[in-house]
Design a protein with these regions (language model features):
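Short helices/loops that flank or line small-molecule/ion binding pockets
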Residues: 86-97, 115, 167-168, 186-193, ...
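Hinge/lid segment of periplasmic solute-binding proteins
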Residues: 106-158, 292-294, 363-366
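Glycine-centered hinge/linker elements that transmit conformational signals in sensory
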Residues: 188, 226-254
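Short, solvent-exposed loop/beta-turn-alpha elements that line the ligand-binding surface or hinge
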Residues: 122-135, 177, 199, 219-236, ...
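Short helix-initiation/N-cap motifs at beta->coil->alpha
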Residues: 79-88, 107, 179-183, 253-263
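C-terminal lobe and pocket-closing loops
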Residues: 279-288, 300-397
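A structural signal for short loop-to-beta-strand junctions that line the ligand-binding cleft
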Residues: 92, 99-100, 129-167, 302-305, ...
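Conserved N-terminal structural module of periplasmic/extracytoplasmic solute-binding proteins
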Residues: 2-111, 126-132, 300-301, 321-324, ...
């Protein structure tokens, strides 16, 4: 998908109205160029992604390996930050000149498939140029829409709860798999009452967390062509959240804004925060406490509603080199050396070849790998919620309107009506 407990993602979504899953944070650009063929049979393909300098460095090292194995395929690169990437891509797609292969997220699959931008990679899979073997926990299905394979995952992530372990230990709280929302909210109140610290930094605007809550209760944020919940559902969610903000159990939204670009969790202005598991390396870098990953609360003591989301590689329906693009994607998701180079930069490595090849040595990444392995072993992973065209705009609206509601600038009832109005427009476009 692709923001959410992550300060960077909140900022990006407000600026761009864009989605998910994972993102790079520094605004940098590489060189672009036209794809084509030369007289000696060498083919050039264009590859674009969003990310920071560190991601660019890793990807360029991976491309060097690919070009060594496939000397007749050259790769021209282009990268920006998340906002600039999607602005440029939208212009390129509208002009009929998108890159041959590009980084993508689930929130954009139906949107650009609807516009005829994405190549169905099944033909290249059937031709033997691209393999769907050895993907972890069925994550390859994230890239499937209406029987078409529109994206190939490069990494996976799932929602998690990051906690300040020292605060939770002092409060005598030990979250375990299957704990309930009632237990979670009781824990937040206990932390507030005993340590004068908000228990959570603001869960109520995270679309992907609310989706898990809805899934636990037989619904979902989206259906294939619309919203999967009603105004009464959201009114209850936001009313409860507003009351907790007023009671001091949730961090004051104004404080959250002041803490940026830091997280209010790592700034010691909250004791927990929901975010994607692969984002959690930031807390140890930013904060002075120790941070851990706790299970998602449940409604029934069993099901968390979780699924694996993913960054993926997609191809242009207009590419003149579908075979070479498929070979490139295949190399980038299956080659063990690429896995060692990329690490968890784009999520937990999606294929077993790469997952087994990369062994993190730092504690935060070891914890992320263990968390995702434990979630899979717990048997709680389901199929990802459908993301209709316009899902990215809905996510941005949900975050923005929830922020206004939590600060009291918009009443809950008005905020709910505003969200449903904006979502209806976005999903109809």
């Amino acid at each position: 998908m692709g923001n959410n407990g992550s300060v960077e993602r909140r900022t990006v979504l407000k600026a761009a109205g864009a989605s998910l899953a994972t993102l790079g944070l520094a605004a940098t650009t590489g060189c672009g160029g036209d794809s084509g063929s030369s007289g000696d049979g060498t083919v050039t393909i264009r590859y674009a992604w969003w990310g920071a300098d560190e991601r660019a460095k890793r990807i360029n090292q991976s491309i060097a390996l690919f070009e060594k194995k496939y000397p007749k395929i050259k790769v021209k690169t282009d990268f920006q930050d998340y906002v600039a990437f999607w602005e440029k891509f939208q212009t390129q797609a509208a002009g009929g000149n998108p890159p041959d292969v590009f980084q993508n997220a689930v929130g954009f699959l139906r949107k650009y498939d609807k516009r005829g931008v994405l190549l169905d990679l099944k033909t290249q899979i059937d031709a033997g140029n691209l393999s769907l073997d050895n993907f972890r926990a069925g994550v390859e299905k994230v890239g499937q829409v209406d029987g078409k394979q529109l994206g190939i995952p490069v990494g996976s992530n799932t929602m998690s709860l990051v906690i300040d372990e020292k605060v939770f230990e002092k409060a005598g709280i030990n979250p375990k798999q299957g704990w309930t929302w009632d237990e979670y909210f009781a824990a937040l109140k206990k932390i507030h009452d005993t340590q004068k610290l908000p228990g959570d930094t603001g869960y109520f605007g995270i679309m992907y967390l609310y989706d898990l809550y809805l899934r636990q209760n037989g619904k979902a944020f989206f259906t294939k062509d619309g919203l999967g919940f009603d105004e009464a559902d959201l009114t209850e969610w936001w009313t409860d959240a507003y009351n907790r903000v007023k009671a001091g159990i949730i961090t004051d939204p104004k404080r959250v804004e002041q803490d940026k670009p830091k997280s209010s969790l790592s700034a010691a202005h909250g004791a927990s925060e929901f975010t994607w598991d692969n984002f959690t390396v930031r807390y140890s870098a930013e904060g002075t406490s120790t941070y851990g990953l706790a299970p998602i609360p449940t409604t029934d003591g069993k099901q968390t509603g979780q699924y694996l989301a993913s960054l993926m590689l997609s191809a242009s329906a207009r590419t003149k080199h579908p075979k070479e693009v498929a070979q490139f994607i295949n190399f980038m998701v299956h080659d063990p050396e690429v896995g060692k180079i990329m690490g968890y930069d784009r999520g937990i490595l999606a294929t077993t070849e790469q997952f087994d090849a990369y062994k993190p040595t730092d504690a935060p990444n070891q914890a992320i790998a263990k968390y995702e392995t434990d979630v899979a072993a717990a048997g709680v992973l389901g199929t990802i919620t459908p993301h209709p065209a316009g899902a990215d705009t809905c996510e941005a609206a949900f975050l923005r309107i929830a922020g206004d509601m939590s600060q009291g600038t918009t009443k809950v009832a008005d905020a709910v009506k505003q969200f449903f109005s904006e979502a209806k427009t976005a999903l109809a476009s």
